[in-house]
Structure formats: structure tokens, C-alpha cells
Amino acid sequence: MTINNENLIWIDLEMTGLNSEIHRIIEIATVITDTKLNIISEGPVIAIHQKEEHIVIMDEWNTKIHKKNGLIKRVQKSIYNESKAESKTIFFLKKWVPIQSSPICGNSVYQDRKFLARYMPNLENYFHYRCIDVSTIKELVNRWCPSFKKIKKQNHTALEDIHESIIELNFYKKIFFDTIKYSK
């Protein structure tokens, strides 16, 4: 176990919807990688208890997915609220990455960051202001090089989504970045 300011923090949240003003976080997971995207450690995967009033406002898509993957039941049984989940996640991160040294990494992380700012501000502050958003690369590839499109499973559990994001970025890295020869 070594703290390193080059390590990357990957995060994924599952939420009851996309509007951070009314929807809530129901699952959080984190993974630490090195700069070459090798997994160093997996953080806690935490279902976050939410009142029934927050569960019932989920749209049809979220309800279907999270019933199928068992997350709704895990949320209803969870002993963690947002504050406890935030503390446990930060405790894990402190073992691997200094505060504000890692960009927030994942897919559509701007969306996760909005929810973190509202419900887990200490965790949101743990990240550097920059981000490594795999969705940006995916959108560019889909438009400019559609033959290289990467298909994801999209089971929508936080840890599985992180692993898919790392695999996806590794795919793009090998195809587009590792082939570039440059000199300083």
C-alpha cells in the first residue's frame, strides 16, 4: 500500500435519476489505478439507504434496471446514509491518493460530480478540479472513427461500470494513444 499522487481515482455513482436537485445517490464505488490503468485497489462498494419517497420517484428506466440488478433491495436494507458512505470512501482514498491530486475518472463524471457536490461535498473536494471522462473520448470516436466503437455491457452497478470504464479507456489508449510516436 503506497500513497502516490500519480494514482487515479475512478468513481461511479448510481442515482435515482439525473437531476441532483431532486434525485439521490443509491450506490457508490471507487477503484484506484496507476497511470497505465492497472488496478491497484478496489474501494468499498456501498448501497446507500434512501427513504421510500426517493425510491418511488425513479423513472421507469432506473426502476427496471435497479430492480433487475438487485440494487433497490440493497438500498432498502443498507445501514449507510450519504455521510457514512462519503466517510468510508474518503478513508479508503487516503491510503492511495493525496487530496486534490487525482482527477475524477470514469464515464460522464460531470454528472457524478454534480451529485457529489450536493450530497457528498467532502468527497467532491477530494478530487482535483480536472477530470478524465471516458465518455468524451467515446463520443469523439463514435463521430470520427465509428468502426472503433466499443460496446459496453451496461449492467449499471457502480463497480462493474468502473471496470468497464477502465477497460474502455484502455481500449482507446491502445488504439489511439499508444500508437502515437512523439519526441520531446
From Swiss-Prot:
It is an enzyme of class 3 (hydrolase). The active site is at Y129. It is found in: Cytoplasm. SUPFAM superfamilies: Ribonuclease H-like (SSF53098). Gene3D superfamilies: Ribonuclease H-like superfamily/Ribonuclease H. Keywords: Cytoplasm, Exonuclease, Hydrolase, Nuclease. Its EC number is 3.1.15.-. GO terms for biological process: DNA metabolic process. Its main location: cytoplasm. Residues 8-169 form the Exonuclease domain. InterPro entries: Exonuclease_RNaseT/DNA_pol3, Oligoribonuclease, RNaseH-like_sf, RNaseH_sf. GO terms for molecular function: 3'-5'-RNA exonuclease activity; nucleic acid binding. One of its GO terms (cellular component) is cytoplasm. The keyword Protein biosynthesis does not apply. It comes from the Bacteria. It holds the Pfam family RNase_T. Belongs to the oligoribonuclease family. 3'-to-5' exoribonuclease specific for small oligoribonucleotides. This is Oligoribonuclease.
